[in-house]
Amino acid sequence: PTSTLNILHGENGSGKTSILESIHLLASGRSFRSRNLEPLINSDKDEAVVFARLLDGKEIGLSKSRRQKHNLKFRSEKQSSWENVARELPCQILDSNSFLLLEGGPKSRRHFLDWGVFHVEHSFVENWRRTKKSIANRNHLLKHRSPDLSQIAAWDSELCLAAKEVHRAREEYFQVFLPLFLDLYRKMNGVDVDALIIEYERGWDADRELEDVLLESRGIDVRYGATQSGPHRADLSFKIGRNRAVDILSRGQQKILVSTMKIAQGLLLSQALDRKCIFLVDDLP
C-alpha cells in the first residue's frame, strides 16, 4: 500500500472484490454486483457490518440485517440518507459493467452525469427530489381512467420549475467536464478526438419549453400512463461521425473511453472541491 494506491492480490475467491464492494457499499448504499444486498450477508450470519475511519478521523459505519433495514452512521450520528456519506467518500467503480456507460440504456449515463453534478452543486439533490416527486404524482394521475387535468397542470408547473434547475446544473457541469475529458482522452491514445462527438440531451425538445411539450404530449402521456418528456429522459450520446461510438470502437477502445470519462470526472471533483476521488478497479477484461 501507498498513500495513493493499494493493490489487492490473491487466489480466485479469496475476497478481493468483496473488499472493493464493501467500500462501494459504504459510500453509496449499493452493491456494484447486485441490486439485492441480501447475498452480502454470510449464510451463517444474520447481519453484515462495514466500518471505515477516514484520514481526517471521521468514522462511517453501516449494518444490514436480514430482517431490518440498514443502519447508517456518520460521525456517530444516524443518517436517513447517503447524502452526507457520499459527499465525504466519493467513489468510482471501474469493472466489466462499466461498459454499460456506452452499451446500456440512458439510466446508466444519467447516473454518471448526476454523480458529477451531485458533488459540485449541493442544491442539485433537492431539485432532483422535487423532479422525482412531481413525475411520480403526475404519473399517478395519468393512470386514472378519467385523469384530473387541473391536478396534472399543477404538477406540470412544479415539474417545470424543478426540471429547469436540474437541466441548468447538468448542462453547466457538462460544459466544464467535456473539455477536461477531451484533453485527457488525447493523452490516453484514444481514437481521433476530433471524430468523437459527445452531446448532452436534456430529455425534451431542445428548441421548446418543457411546459409546451408537456401540454402537447398530454394525450400520449395519458395513453401510456407515464410522463414521456422531462429530465428523467436525459441522456448522453456518443458518436464517431454519424455512427454510434459503441458500433465503431473496439472493445479496447471502449475501455479507454469509459475509463477516461470516469478518471476525468474524478479530476474535476478534485479541482472543484480539493478532495480526492476513490477509484475501485476490479478485473477489467
Annotate each language-model stretch with its function:
Residues 1-11, 24-25, 37, 53, ...:
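Conserved NTPase motor "head" modules and their coupling/switch loops across ABC/AAA+ ATPases, GTPases
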Residues 16:
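Conserved lysine of the Walker
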Residues 24-108, 114-124, 175-183, 196, ...:
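Nucleotide-state sensing region of NTPase/ATPase domains
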Residues 31, 143-147, 271:
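Short, flexible helix-adjacent loops and helix caps
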Residues 45, 49-52, 139, 143, ...:
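Alpha-helix boundary/capping detector
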Residues 99-190, 201:
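An accessory alpha-helical subdomain
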Residues 282-284:
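Walker B catalytic acidic pair
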